[in-house]
Amino acid sequence: MQDINSGSSSMKDTYSSWIEISKRSLSNNLDNFRSILRPNSTLTAILKSNAYGHGIEPMTRLCIEAGISRIGVNSIEEALLIRNIDSKIPILIMGEIQNPEKRKNVLSDPNFWIVFSRPETARILSSFLPAPKLHLKIDTGMGRLGSHGETLKQTLSELKNVGITLGGICTHFASTEDVLEHKYSLMQTQKFEEAIFLAKSFGYNHLIRHACASASTMLFPNAHFDMVRIGISLYGLWPSIQTRLSLNLTGNKNFQLNPILSWKSRIVHIQYHPADSYIGYGSTFQTSYPTKVAIVPVGYYEGLDRKLSSNGDMLVLGKKARIIGRICMNMTMLDVTHIPGAEVGSIVTIIGQDGEESITADDLADRTHTINYEVMTRISESIPRIVVD
């Protein structure tokens, strides 16, 4: 993936499409989260999955420049990309590490904070010199990684018996984003507090405690503990409409998020077709009037969902242009009959704002029956990311 700073943005004229990342909007989002954080809690920027499609390398640089002191990722590979940019920033690795003994050379980093579920993993990692910091994962109701009940007690006992040092303890909320009534999340918070107390009974005091992601950070200030993990909303996207409504119900109606990503391309060809012409693979679309068709060099390889075929729009010169026919691997056709000025070279906005019109990740998610997370993370890493403003 190409990471291009604002000084090189004129190069975008040669790309089939490009991503623009707004430094100003990122700063606004960070300021808004910092304004609601409990005093002793630290914001960790989650940059996993190519920074939710925004580009892990440019986002790392922007976050560090904005004062972020901790970064979270899913994998060793992502952590190493960040380590190449900053040699000392603490990096939380949240995904399960397989065969850690085979990665000793890269995992021997005291500023890697590694989340683990199994005591075997902790034994291996703690033998490294220098050893990474270990964060024990608690399953409070997600039913995924971590342990609970008797298994948790056995894990803590085993860790204590072999003298393993812990640096942190963490959990993850299962359904905060999906509901307006948060009984389950409150139950998870209680279970996490019980797990913290249990860890103390084994002598594990002064651990870095963290539970909240974006939605829970907004809604549960009592669960901020020592650290929060901000992912989707770092990029200016709401985790769900339920999250936004829940926040309004708490009386906080002023919290704002600003999407930081725009995805753009250009028209590369114009065709004029008479009525009753077929457009695209499978001849699934037939014109009903003389139609001006614009070709955009973006398709499902680049991350545009094929379910948007004849079911979505792009923006051209501040107006919506309907996608017609099937989205191809690397091309999409638009009806620009109503946009006289549309021509080869005209900028096309796939996600973002043009004049008074906008197309958001949520718009695309609604059309394709998915979530904004998937819309963003499926944008191809091959598309250059350019930092603007």
From Swiss-Prot:
Record-linked SUPFAM superfamilies: Alanine racemase C-terminal domain-like (SSF50621), PLP-binding barrel (SSF51419)
UniProt cofactor(s): pyridoxal 5'-phosphate
Active site residues of this protein: K48, Y281
Reactions catalysed: L-alanine = D-alanine
Binding site for substrate: R144, M329
One Pfam family matching this protein: Ala_racemase_C
Protein family (similarity comment): Belongs to the alanine racemase family.
GO MF, any single term: alanine racemase activity
Enzyme Commission number, as recorded: 5.1.1.1
Pathway: Amino-acid biosynthesis; D-alanine biosynthesis; D-alanine from L-alanine: step 1/1
GO cellular component terms, A-Z: cytosol
Record protein name field: Alanine racemase
One example of a Gene Ontology biological process annotation: D-alanine biosynthetic process
Sorted UniProt keywords: Isomerase, Pyridoxal phosphate
Keyword Metal-binding set for record: no
Group of enzyme by EC: isomerase
Modified residues (N6-(pyridoxal phosphate)lysine): K48
Function: Catalyzes the interconversion of L-alanine and D-alanine. May also act on other amino acids.
